[in-house]
Amino acid sequence: MSPSLVSDTQKHERGSHGVKIKHFSPYIAVCVTTFSLAFCCFMVHGAITRQPTHLLPFFFIQVFDLIICLIHILGFMSSTSDIRLVIHTKTGPIYIKSTGLTFIILSISRMMLAFKAYCLGMVWDCYKYLMLNRRGNLLDDWYSDQWGHLSTFWSLLRTGRNRGNNSIGNSGSPNEPNTRPRPDTITYDPANDLPKYEDILKIPANAYTPPPYYCSNTNGNVNTTTTDAVTTNTTITSATTVNATTTITTNANTNTSTTTSVISPLTTTNKDDTQINNASSNAHSSC
């Protein structure tokens, strides 16, 4: 390379470097760094105090950073030839093919996107964990979901974050549901929380009157049922007695009527015989 070409290249580099310094503003970098640190501290405070809403600002910053990184990668991919030209115009020229340069840029960009997506997924998982704890749900309901609650491309990045450890250790298979019994709810026993002796002395003697006397509902129902049963039996007995008496009376009346009807013809026959005998006696007397 001729000395004139080297001097022109150095001048061009100095000029471009000077333009970059003119357009660079350190105040913007300081503001971005300050806000990033503030939101990071806010996220740590929310994770310690279990307040999920404090994690949202840092989460949105990560989403914005991921989008900006993706745009930068697309810009580098569209200007690969310019990068190759800059590399070849250095003092010590480096000869590299465009295919190799594209492969290097793609590898680095994929690693950056994967790392940013992994961090974003961790923040989202922490937010969902705190929300479920606030609602009173158990961790098993969260770990039983193998695909998570954020159905995007970074849900496939599960390296180092196996959510199914608890369910696999308990049930033996990640596809089997978790059948562990839930812990019993804690009940409050008022007998263990007794009042103080001084508070009891301050209560007047007639503050609580005794309740009125009453029979037990169970005994009352049993007695009522027994009384009803006895009454029913008595009614049935009375009805049976009345029916028997009526039947006997009817039979007696029937027998009496039959006897009367039988006696009446006999009496009539006897009267006729008496009249015949009297008539024959009168005839003999006349003779």
Curated annotation (Swiss-Prot):
The chain crosses the membrane at residues 28-48, 56-76, 92-114. Keywords: Cell membrane, Membrane, Receptor, Transmembrane, Transmembrane helix. GO terms for cellular component: lysosomal membrane; plasma membrane. The keyword Cell division does not apply. The keyword Transmembrane helix applies. It is a multi-pass membrane protein. It is found in: Cell membrane. Residues 165-190 are annotated as: Disordered. InterPro entries: LAPTM_transporter (IPR051115). It comes from the Eukaryota. Signal peptide: none annotated. Interacts (via N-terminal extracellular domain) with human C2a. PANTHER family: LYSOSOMAL-ASSOCIATED TRANSMEMBRANE PROTEIN (PTHR12479:SF10). Cell surface receptor that binds to human complement C2a protein. This results in inhibition of the classical and lectin pathways of complement activation, probably due to interference with binding of C2a to C4b and interference with cleavage by C1 or MASP2 such that C3 convertase cannot be formed. This infers resistance to complement-mediated cell lysis, allowing parasite survival and infection. This is Tetraspanning orphan receptor. It comes from Trypanosoma cruzi. The lineage of its organism: Eukaryota, Discoba, Euglenozoa, Kinetoplastea, Metakinetoplastina.
